[in-house]
């Protein structure tokens, strides 16, 4: 069993966040000894899932719904699976957006390395948009690709 302070350190979360999660009912079976929360393995696993879902962009109200489904047993497996499929898609979309952002940053790093080497941007601008070095062209193309939602 762990105290709220220990769990706070383990997960790098403020104690106030853990208290908030408890207040919201995300640890329904947490033990209390003399009104002090004691976190067991069940709460730690719940916290891992809660943090995963939060990092994926899910709101607390939806996490609460997931936790409610968990407490309702195996009849809610389809809803839980659907929730994770939806979050998986959201994360994959965000990863694609970040990959494009990273390619723009990679291109600009190369761009300014060349500008520093050449003393100006003239040579680079002559190569744009389609005469860049072989290893840079796909990065440039991806970073400058127009995405229609």
Q: Model regions: which residues?
A:
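Residue-level recognition of short, well-ordered coil/turn positions
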Residues: 26, 58, 74-75, 120
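Basic helix-turn-helix/winged-helix DNA-binding cores
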Residues: 1-68
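C-terminal regulatory/oligomerization modules of transcriptional regulators
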Residues: 75-149
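Short linear sequence elements within intrinsically disordered, low-complexity coil regions
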Residues: 7, 25-26, 44, 71, ...
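A short, mixed-charge helix-start or loop-turn motif at secondary-structure junctions
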Residues: 32, 73-74
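Long, amphipathic alpha-helical segments that form or neighbor coiled-coils/leucine zippers used
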Residues: 65-68, 72, 84
């Amino acid at each position: 069993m762990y105290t709220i302070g220990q769990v706070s350190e383990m997960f790098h979360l403020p104690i106030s966040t853990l208290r908030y999660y408890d207040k919201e009912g995300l640890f329904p079976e947490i033990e209390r000894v003399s009104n002090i929360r004691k976190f067991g393995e069940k709460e730690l696993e719940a916290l891992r899932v809660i943090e995963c879902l939060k990092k994926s962009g899910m709101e607390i109200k939806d996490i609460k719904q997931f936790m409610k489904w968990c407490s309702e047993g195996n009849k809610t497996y389809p809803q839980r699976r659907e929730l994770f499929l939806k979050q998986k898609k959201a994360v994959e979309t965000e990863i694609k957006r970040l990959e494009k952002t990273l390619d723009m940053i990679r291109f600009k790093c190369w761009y300014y390395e060349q500008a520093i080497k050449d003393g100006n941007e003239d040579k680079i601008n002559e190569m744009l948009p389609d005469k860049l070095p072989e290893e840079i062209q796909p990065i440039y193309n991806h970073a400058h690709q127009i995405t229609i939602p």
